[in-house]
Amino acid sequence: MPNEGIPHSSQTQEQDCLQSQPVSNNEEMAIKQESGGDGEVEEYLSFRSVGDGLSTSAVGCASAAPRRGPALLHIDRHQIQAVEPSAQALELQGLGVDVYDQDVLEQGVLQQVDNAIHEASRASQLVDVEKEYRSVLDDLTSCTTSLRQINKIIEQLSPQAATSRDINRKLDSVKRQKYNKEQQLKKITAKQKHLQAILGGAEVKIELDHASLEEDAEPGPSSLGSMLMPVQETAWEELIRTGQMTPFGTQIPQKQEKKPRKIMLNEASGFEKYLADQAKLSFERKKQGCNKRAARKAPAPVTPPAPVQNKNKPNKKARVLSKKEERLKKHIKKLQKRALQFQGKVGLPKARRPWESDMRPEAEGDSEGEESEYFPTEEEEEEEDDEVEGAEADLSGDGTDYELKPLPKGGKRQKKVPVQEIDDDFFPSSGEEAEAASVGEGGGGGRKVGRYRDDGDEDYYKQRLSPKMPRTLSLHEITDLLETDDSIEASAIVIQPPENATAPVSDEESGDEEGGTINNLPGSLLHTAAYLIQDGSDAESDSDDPSYAPKDDSPDEVPSTFTVQQPPPSRRRKMTKILCKWKKADLTVQPVAGRVTAPPNDFFTVMRTPTEILELFLDDEVIELIVKYSNLYACSKGVHLGLTSSEFKCFLGIIFLSGYVSVPRRRMFWEQRTDVHNVLVSAAMRRDRFETIFSNLHVADNANLDPVDKFSKLRPLISKLNERCMKFVPNETYFSFDEFMVPYFGRHGCKQFIRGKPIRFGYKFWCGATCLGYICWFQPYQGKNPNTKHEEYGVGASLVLQFSEALTEAHPGQYHFVFNNFFTSIALLDKLSSMGHQATGTVRKDHIDRVPLESDVALKKKERGTFDYRIDGKGNIVCRWNDNSVVTVASSGAGIHPLCLVSRYSQKLKKKIQVQQPNMIKVYNQFMGGVDRADENIDKYRASIRGKKWYSSPLLFCFELVLQNAWQLHKTYDEKPVDFLEFRRRVVCHYLETHGHPPEPGQKGRPQKRNIDSRYDGINHVIVKQGKQTRCAECHKNTTFRCEKCDVALHVKCSVEYHTE
């Protein structure tokens, strides 16, 4: 660099070395200008113009370190406005250098730096977009190729889809893949257009031309899976895959596979034809055997008959059979013998022999000369030879049609095999038995043989078994027959496996309800052949049949060597079936009258307080029972409890108070801190006394518990409360019956889990209540009910009957009960009707399977408000109504009319519409929710104090229940009733204020600590003078000052340290 542009003075050189920046080091100059320099930068920076247009520094400092590497950015000084020559200093005008204003120069340099950064980021972004665009093109090519392959596969599979179910499923799968590929192609195309808008230009067109050339190429192997189309492979690859050649070209010798001959008697595919063919074949072979034996026994030698030529192998001599072939031949003879023996019993199910389970149907293409999978042993062959010879003796020698005859029962080595029927529970009726006499009369010691009317009579035997013969109908046809004809009594339906039993079954079912009903079976099973097994063994069915004419077997016809053998009784429990004739008609019945006698309202003639109403249930007898057994239990543990009735009422008041004033820990009721301290509780009972009573609370004697009753610890209290709840039942006609959950999270055998309930874990109680929520009767659920009364009606129905009997015993009359589908059945309605009551309830589908109502699927397709109904001869009506879903209701006290209109919102019309509703649905909705209302009232202010023992939750529930019942009576008979919370508060205040015992005055305990947050807040901590000296909270010396806010003694000098954290 020339040195004429540098000032000659040493001072100027030093300043230029400190302040000026060369053009080649523009990055450092920009950083220093942004940071503001060191405060000594002058106003002007001079550059000298060079002929090549590059600006050089006016300063050259020898001590400056050169920059390593090429420059990242060159500043174009021509883009920066220079200072006018007239405004330059006189010393600079004669030097011929460019002079710039410092602010202008800084702005110009920063602007060029920003532009360079923006261009660099733009270039980097274009590179990324270009890479993404290439990836999109690859995806587009792959997706297009897959679509072409899928279209070809669809063209190949479409002609075969109508004939094959498997190919139809594959075709559906391919179409779903095509739809997914089309959606993917749309997304890729949209992304391609977006990237084209960013890139634009010729490069995109070049790529598109390249992609269009690739579309004309032949597609490669399919990658859609083996279910779509096999991959094209060469002959070499096929040999390697099948194991005929190694990958190195070596041929592998293959063993000839001999397919075993499969023999099976297929009863469902032409069994009679099979018997005829086998009989003919057996006749021909046994005829040849007879001729051979006759030739061997002849005295003179005879010419042996010519060997029988095989049709499959003509012009060949008969070869000597091997040992295995002889065994196979004897085995076939055995099959033929069995076929001849059982030809008279065509259609009867027979027991499968052990070796028949391994047999499979003969495959197509199997020759007769191939070996079978089963070969009998030598012992079996020897035993069967005698039987075959005896059968061959009866064969005629001519070529006439062969007549089947019974095999002779004699024989030296005849094996006796007991015949076992398929239906073990089938026994002939007593009317079919004939008279018999003992065997060996006078000789003694003879055996006894049973003799029945059908022995030896083939026609009558078939007539007796005809109800059990399978019918060649489909399962769907059999179910339609049972629904339309009520006279058919079926004991079982036997379903054969479908043809595609191993194929995957679709999840789509014909019904949408849970359970094993006919509406839940798939279509493949509905079209399967099935057998209808009817109750043909019943003696009544024989006598009722007019075409039945029993044969008169007199005692003279029975040989004297026979005696009667009684069949054993059947183990199968016969259910009593009620056959009803249903018709479409409405129920016309008058509602029940309700209670006969009026309730004793003497107590409610005067206004009663909440406590007095509660003590109708928790009277002196109940409280004395609790006090007695609690003291007894404490005494057995060596603790002197000394509980009294007054003290228990105070304890019960604290329990009720915890329902609407809950704290995380029950001990917090007795704390002295002002945020949780409860004056009413702490003044009524000491904390430790409450804990002692709660841990020893009992209502039964542990030494005399019923081992069968799982709730025997609570049974005395439950029984007494049931008596009092039933005594004060309001005068109602309609009562609901439902279940009630008590929360419990411990371990117990009776704990239940009910999904979808507000309380999922806990004990379940069966409750009968009025429509407003007064619980009349309750029992805990403990699995198997120890009370076996009415158990023939089921668990739910027996509980309803027990409740109705208890209600009728306490208040004679006729009532209307409402319950849900767990309890409802036609048998329960009949039983309640016989007791003079009426009932209404939703019913499950399997409880009314014989009622010919319109199906749920058909009703759902119709408009809302459509219903179908039927009535039987006993006054029970069943109605199926379509609302949001299809609901089925059965009733013996409410019919269809009068119809009412209810408001429903229509999603289709986007407005509320009027829907007609049968009267029995209205009755159910109006009177069903009594137990749920009681559950809501109790759960709203449930006691928050819990115990660790399993019986603490149901015990406290009993107290909550009677408190809720007392409030229901208060609402019924009081002219100015209060809500449940106010009623509860009045009971609590009365018990704690009347029966509470305030603690005796004694030594004052340690004062509670002040809140730490208010100690260090620095607000209103004023030091004031106090009357007497106390210990300073900081230095623990005596002082007459204290902090008014913290209420602690403090010196003035200690105040700052105490209030500083």
Swiss-Prot record:
Sequence positions bearing Phosphoserine: 158, 429-430, 554
A Pfam family per the record: DDE_Tnp_1_7
Ranges of compositional bias, category Basic and acidic residues: 353-363, 451-462
One of the record's GO molecular function terms: sequence-specific DNA binding
Location within or outside the cell: Nucleus
Any single Gene Ontology cellular-component annotation: nucleoplasm
Position(s), cross-link Glycyl lysine isopeptide (Lys-Gly) (interchain with G-Cter in SUMO2): 255
GO annotation terms (biological process): positive regulation of defense response to virus by host; positive regulation of DNA repair; positive regulation of gene expression; positive regulation of peptidyl-serine phosphorylation of STAT protein
Keywords for the protein's UniProt record, in alphabetical order: Disease variant, Isopeptide bond, Nucleus, Phosphoprotein, Premature ovarian failure, Ubl conjugation
Source domain of life: Eukaryota
Feature: compositional bias, Acidic residues: 364-392, 506-515
Distribution of this protein across tissues and organs: Expressed in heart and oocytes, but not in granulosa cells (at protein level).
Polar residues: bias regions: 8-27
InterPro entries: PGBD, PiggyBac_TE-derived
Stretches the record annotates as Disordered: 1-39, 287-323, 344-466, 494-521, 537-573
Function: Involved in repair of DNA damage following UV irradiation, acting either in the absence of ERCC6 or synergistically with ERCC6. Involved in the regulation of gene expression. In the absence of ERCC6, induces the expression of genes characteristic of interferon-like antiviral responses. This response is almost completely suppressed in the presence of ERCC6. In the presence of ERCC6, regulates the expression of genes involved in metabolism regulation, including IGFBP5 and IGFBP7.
Disease connection: Premature ovarian failure 11: An ovarian disorder defined as the cessation of ovarian function under the age of 40 years. It is characterized by oligomenorrhea or amenorrhea, in the presence of elevated levels of serum gonadotropins and low estradiol.
Protein name, per record: Chimeric ERCC6-PGBD3 protein
Species whose genome carries this gene: Homo sapiens (Human)
Gene: ERCC6
